[in-house]
A protein has these predicted regions:
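Extracellular, beta-strand-rich glycan-interacting domains
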Residues: 30-58, 79-85, 248-250, 258, ...
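Secretory/extracellular carbohydrate-interaction modules
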Residues: 143-211
């Protein structure tokens, strides 16, 4: 905040970005940032207004960075662009005040000019068995033997268009439901604040594929409004399996795939790019739809990672690197023609 004293330029202090060491003055706990950095400026000796570094986009109305601001950085100033994956601490101010990189830092294609969706920390259920979101919003860890379901939604929603994302099943314990919710139904159905799974209870506002592979509790079913619409999707979830989701908000259809193959709807193998054999059909309401997951812990702590196109499952990069037809996103498997990664540029164009 304005006029707040920082540890920068004190001379006798180790300067850190993304890490706060409270050992000397607080409770001895060191905390770390779990998020994204874009352009990071530190100016020594001059106070500039925000308009020096950013401006309002005339088309979208969004605040965007000025990529080459006119700034005098001073002797100890620096400008981190994070544009070199092998030297994320390189100073672009001209001062050569380079930083040493520590920890498991990853370069991201998600930037203020094109943000990809992540898990939303504001959509977590509040209770004593709180799930933990990490890896810049791409990993969700539940609690072992909590017998408590939690729904977590994405940071971005869509009202129209065709969308694709991938979720990695990364545990042998509990259940993982992968799907989407109608935003207007969140509070009305209490499926965020109460102990609910996607598609659970008297909930006509969420749709999901349910996966489980724990102590005989092997499930692979479609779930909506507290009912199973398909008793067996013909796959067996295992640790490391990738569940694919195709959501068509132009025609009210949804499909799920498993490790690169669209699953059978009961009438035939789904073909999202032609609209054939959807796993669900629904009437699209005039409101936002949010990608979502729910986890339910028993016989092991449930965990999943999600990739909306950023190219990683947690800290692990995808092996393949397939983009959508607009050239955005990086996926393990093909989004198929006409389906797009969940990012702000695609939503501006298609959503």
């Amino acid at each position: 905040s304005q006029n707040n004293d920082t540890e920068f330029n004190k001379g006798d202090e180790v300067e850190e970005i993304g890490r706060f060491n409270k050992a000397d003055t607080y409770d001895g706990i060191t905390t770390y940032t779990s998020g994204h950095f874009a352009h990071y400026h530190f100016v020594d000796g001059t106070a500039y207004p925000a308009s020096t570094f950013g401006e309002v986009d005339s088309t979208t109305g969004e605040w965007k960075a000025k990529l080459s601001p006119s700034v005098t950085y001073g002797s100890k100033g620096f400008f981190l662009k994070f544009e070199n994956a092998s030297a994320l601490g390189a100073d672009s101010s001209g001062n050569s005040n380079n930083w040493s990189v520590n920890g498991n830092l990853k370069q991201s294609i998600s930037t203020p000019n094109n943000l990809f969706a992540t898990f939303n920390v504001n959509h977590k259920q509040v209770n004593t068995n709180q799930a933990v979101i990490s890896s810049a919003g791409t990993q969700l860890d539940g609690v072992n033997d909590s017998y408590t379901a939690q729904i977590v939604c994405a940071t971005l929603g869509m009202m129209k268009g065709k969308w694709y994302w991938e979720t990695k099943y990364s545990t042998v314990g509990g259940y993982l439901n992968v799907g989407f919710v109608k935003n207007g139904g969140l509070d009305a159905t209490e499926n965020i604040r109460l102990n609910k799974e996607l598609g659970d209870g008297a909930d006509a506002n969420s749709w999901a594929f349910k996966a489980g592979n724990s102590s005989g509790q092997i499930v692979k079913k479609l779930r909506h409004n507290n009912g199973y619409t398909n008793s067996d999707m013909g796959v067996t979830p295992a640790n490391g399996s990738i569940i694919q989701t195709w959501l068509d908000l132009d025609n009210g259809k949804a499909w799920w795939g498993f490790n690169g193959t669209v699953m059978n709807s009961g009438s035939g193998v789904g073909v999202p790019n032609t609209g054939a054999y959807p796993h669900f059909t629904f009437t699209v309401a005039d409101e936002f739809y949010l990608p979502a997951v729910s986890i339910f812990g028993f016989n092991g702590a449930p965990q999943c990672q999600i990739n909306f196109g950023e190219g990683r499952f947690g800290a692990t990069a995808v092996a393949s690197g397939v983009s959508d037809n607009a050239g955005h996103g990086t996926f393990e498997f093909s989004p198929l023609a006409g389906f797009y990664s969940v990012c702000t540029k695609n939503i501006q164009t298609y959503g």
